[in-house]
Amino acid sequence: MAQLVHVNGPPGIGKSTLSALYAERHPGTLNLDVDVVHRLVGGWTDEDNRTWEVVTPLIRAMARTQLDGGRDVVVPQYHARPEEISALEELARKQGAVFREVVLLDERSAAIERFGRRARDDDDTYIQYMHHHVGSRGGAARLGAMYDALLDLLRLLPDATVVPSTAGAVEETYAMLTDALRGPGG
């Protein structure tokens, strides 16, 4: 049975890296990285372009098509509102797929530091854009609030699996992720 795996976690925690690795090692899996799709829309750096209004339906349509074909989808994306998770879960259910919620977590202060380090170490346009975007909206305080919101959400998601994510431990974290997906329901 196909599955839709939502890889959640604070910004900069390793969601995109681990999802790309998962798709690479599980042929046929669609790594539906929202950050990548976002960049496909012309003018995505212009806030007035409201790119998210286009990207969200695109992501859902792509996931639906992949699941209809009986293939897995992995979606690396921070979500901290219950309705965002419910929408993904409902999409999977309507396509006859299993929904899995995996949350990557590090300590709060480490997660905030990892976001900053990512921008210092990587000149990728999207990473730099998001660093500026978050910085203009409160920086570390905003990241802390996002982390706290994610922890609050976890209390509402009894079926979510938390996977510890340590900076630089990609293979170790990947092993825990795949173990979690092989567990009940995976």
What are these regions (language model features)?
Residues 13:
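ATP-binding Walker
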Residues 54-99:
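Glycine-rich phosphate-binding loop used to anchor ATP phosphates in small-molecule kinases
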Residues 10:
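P-loop (Walker A) phosphate-binding loop of NTP-binding proteins
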Residues 1-4, 71:
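Pre-Walker A (Motif I) flank of P-loop NTPase domains
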Residues 16-69:
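Conserved substrate/cofactor phosphate-moiety recognition/catalytic segment
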Residues 7:
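Hydrophobic anchor at the beta1->P-loop junction of P-loop NTPases
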Residues 121-172:
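Small-molecule kinase domains that catalyze NTP-dependent phosphoryl transfer to phosphate-bearing small molecules
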Residues 95-115:
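Conserved phosphate-donor/acceptor-positioning beta-strand/loop module used by diverse small-molecule
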